[in-house]
């Protein structure tokens, strides 16, 4: 007769399994080797969710807002002091022809007009800088 096959499991093993099953029931997360997952939330989870709901204020009038306000709506336009808005300094004379060309291509009303170029015919316009192209597209 085979004596090893008919042995009962020892009490220590039974107690260990029972303790493990109790632990699994109290543990809030599902373990992959459990037989059946419980559909109800553990009591500690219910207690936490109720207490958090009680602490939060009820906010019924939440309105979506824009992070960048539409001009004319929302915050008023800020009028900066005069010291912050000062006209740019006059450009150096060596780049005057470039600025004239830019003014012709991109006219703006808020910039002051540059004085006309007054150089002798035999002198180059600038020293060391190439002349502007003869034809303006």
Swiss-Prot record:
Q: Where is this region: Disordered?
A: 110-137
- Give the protein's recorded name: Uncharacterized protein C3orf22 homolog
Give the CC-aspect GO terms. Answer: cytoplasm
Record's InterPro entries? C3orf22
Q: Where in the cell is it found?
A: Cytoplasm
Q: Does the keyword Cytoplasm apply?
A: yes
Organism of this sequence: Mus musculus (Mouse)
Compositional bias (Polar residues) spans?
119-129
Tell me which UniProt keywords the record has, alphabetically. Answer: Cytoplasm
